[in-house]
C-alpha cells in the first residue's frame, strides 16, 4: 500500500518539476503536500513495513498478537496518511526525515502508524535475539535493526516530550532529528541482511527454478504455505555460496556496525534535545558512525562479484541494482555543498539501494511462502528498469544541483534559466517516470504471484 501510494504521488512530483511539463500541469500548490506524503510513505512506512517482514521471517514463534495488532494499526495509519493530502487543511512543513502536514488527519495517521510499528519492534526484540549469539548472522542483523528502531522511536517520544513548541519548521526539524538519524542505522543493517540472504539463496542449487516448478500463483506442496515461516539461509553458510565467510565473522561485523548506536542515548542523556550541540552531534554520528558498516559493505561487494556467473534471476538483478545505487548515493554524499538538489540526489541513491534490496528479498521470500517461483523477463528486468530510472533521476538532480537548482521547490520557483539546469531537471523527470514504471512492474510481478488464479 505504501509503495503504491508513494509511486502515484511520485508521478505528480516529477511532472511538477520537469521543464515544459510543469507549465502544462501547474501543480505547484499541491507539490509540497504530495512531497510530504511521498517521502513518508516511501521511506518511513515502506521501510518499517518491510523491516517487520524481516523480523517475522527471522524471528521465533510467539507473541503473534503483537504482530497482528501492529499490522492492523500500521495499515490503518498508512491508509489515512495516503489520502491526507486530498483532505482539507493540508498545510505542509518540509522538515527533514519525517515531513508533516499540519492537519489533524495526518497527525492521527502518524500516531497510529507509530503505535503499530512500536508493537512490531517490541515483538522483534523478543523473538529475534540471535541463538547462538555469534552463530546466526542474519538474526544478529535483524535484532540490531530492531534495537535501532527502538532507539529511534524512543528518541521521537523523548523529543516530543521535552522540545518546546516553536516555529513549525524548526520544531519538526528538531523533533525528528535524532530519531531520523538513528533510523538510518536500522535501514542500513537490514539492507545488508537482505543482501546476504539474497546472495545465499542465489548460491544454492535450488535458486534456479527446477523443471516442473509451480506456475505463477500455484503453490508447491513441498514449500511452506502462505502464513508459514520461510526458511532463512543456514547460519553457517557464506554469502553467495561461494565466499568462505564464517557465521561468527559475519555476526561480529553486524555488532561492530551497530556500535555507534550506543552514542544515541548518551547524546540524549547529556545534551537537551533541540540545542545546537545536540543536533551537531547527530550530524557527526552519521559521518563517524557509518564507516563502521565498511566490513559488511565489503562482504556485500564480494557477494555481488560472486553472483556474476550465476544464472539470471530477479533477486540477482535486484542485488546488483541495490548495491550500485547505494554506492552512488554514498559517493554523492561527499559532493554536497550548500542547500541544493544534490542533497535529494544523495538520499535517493541511498534509499533506493535499500528499496531494491527489499524488492530482491521479496522475490526470494514469495516462493518460500507458497506463492510460486518468481520467473519471467518482467521480473528479471524490473530491478534494472526501476534502478536505471532512479539512476537517471539521481544524476539529473546531481547535475542540476551543481548549477544551483534549489531543493523542495517546483514550477517557476525553480528558476530554471540556463540550458544545463533544464537538461538536468529534464533528466530528473525522465528518470523519475521510468522509475515509476519499474515500481509498477514490481507490484504487478508480486500481485501475479499472490492473487488466486482460476484453475
Label every model-predicted segment.
Residues 1-4, 62-75, 134-150, 246-258, ...:
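Interfacial and helix-entry/exit segments of alpha-helical transmembrane bundles
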Residues 11, 15-26, 31-128, 160-164, ...:
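Membrane-interface helix-loop-helix modules in multi-pass inner-membrane proteins
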Amino acid at each position: 500500500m505504501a509503495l503504491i501510494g508513494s509511486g502515484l504521488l511520485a508521478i505528480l512530483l516529477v511532472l511538477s518539476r520537469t521543464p515544459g511539463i510543469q507549465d502544462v500541469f501547474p501543480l505547484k500548490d499541491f507539490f509540497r503536500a504530495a512531497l510530504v506524503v511521498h517521502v513518508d510513505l516511501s521511506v518511513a512506512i515502506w521501510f518499517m513495513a518491510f523491516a517487520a517482514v524481516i523480523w517475522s521471517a527471522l524471528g521465533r514463534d510467539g507473541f503473534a498478537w503483537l504482530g497482528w495488532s501492529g499490522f492492523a494499526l500500521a495499515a490503518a495509519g498508512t491508509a489515512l496518511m495516503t489520502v491526507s493530502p486530498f483532505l482539507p487543511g493540508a498545510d505542509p512543513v518540509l522538515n527533514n526525515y519525517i515531513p508533516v502536514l499540519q492537519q489533524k488527519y495526518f497527525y492521527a495517521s502518524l500516531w497510529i502508524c507509530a503505535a503499530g510499528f512500536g508493537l512490531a519492534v517490541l515483538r522483534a526484540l523478543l523473538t529475534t535475539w540471535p541463538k547462538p549469539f555469534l552463530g546466526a548472522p542474519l538474526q544478529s542483523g535483524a535484532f540490531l535493526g530492531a534495537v535501532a528502531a527502538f532507539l529511534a522511536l524512543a528518541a521521537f517520544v523523548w523529543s516530543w516530550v521535552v522540545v518546546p513548541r516553536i516555529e513549525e519548521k524548526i520544531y519538526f526539524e528538531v523533533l525528528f532529528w535524532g530519531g531520523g538519524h538513528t533510523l538510518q542505522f536500522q535501514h542500513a543493517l537490514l539492507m545488508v541482511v537482505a543482501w546476504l540472504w539474497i546472495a545465499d539463496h542465489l548460491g544454492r542449487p535450488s535458486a534456479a527454478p527446477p523443471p516442473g516448478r509451480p506456475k505463477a500463483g500455484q503453490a508447491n506442496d513441498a514449500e511452506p504455505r502462505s502464513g508459514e515461516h520461510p526458511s532463512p539461509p543456514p547460519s553457517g553458510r557464506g554469502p553467495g555460496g561461494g565466499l568462505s565467510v564464517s557465521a561468527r565473522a559475519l555476526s561480529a561485523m553486524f555488532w561492530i556496525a551497530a556500535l555507534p548506536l550506543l552514542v544515541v542515548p548518551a547524546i540524549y542523556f547529556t545534551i537537551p534535545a533541540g540545542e545546537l550541540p545536540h543536533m551537531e552531534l547527530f550530524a557527526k554520528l552519521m559521518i563517524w558512525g557509518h564507516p563502521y558498516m565498511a566490513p559488511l559493505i565489503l562482504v556485500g561487494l564480494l557477494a555481488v562479484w560472486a553472483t556474476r556467473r550465476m544464472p539470471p534471476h530477479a533477486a540477482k538483478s535486484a542485488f546488483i541494482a541495490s548495491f550500485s545505487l547505494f554506492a552512488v548515493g554514498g559517493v554523492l554524499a561527499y559532493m554536497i555543498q550548500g542547500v541544493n538538489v544534490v542533497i535529494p540526489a544523495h538520499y535517493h541513491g541511498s534509499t533506493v539501494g535499500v528499496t531494491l534490496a527489499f524488492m530482491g528479498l521479496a522475490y526470494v521470500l514469495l516462493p518460500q511462502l507458497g506463492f510460486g517461483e518468481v520467473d519471467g523477463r518482467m521480473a528479471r528486468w524490473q530491478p534494472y528498469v526501476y534502478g536505471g530510472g532512479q539512476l537517471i533521476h539521481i544524476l539529473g538532480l546531481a547535475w542540476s544541483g551543481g548549477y544551483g537548482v534549489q531543493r523542495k521547490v517546483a514550477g517557476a520557483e525553480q528558476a530554471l534559466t540556463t540550458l544545463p539546469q533544464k537538461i538536468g531537471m529534464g533528466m530528473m523527470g525522465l528518470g523519475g517516470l521510468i522509475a515509476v514504471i519499474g515500481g509498477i512492474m514490481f507490484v504487478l510481478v508480486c500481485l501475479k504471484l499472490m492473487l488466486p488464479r482460476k484453475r
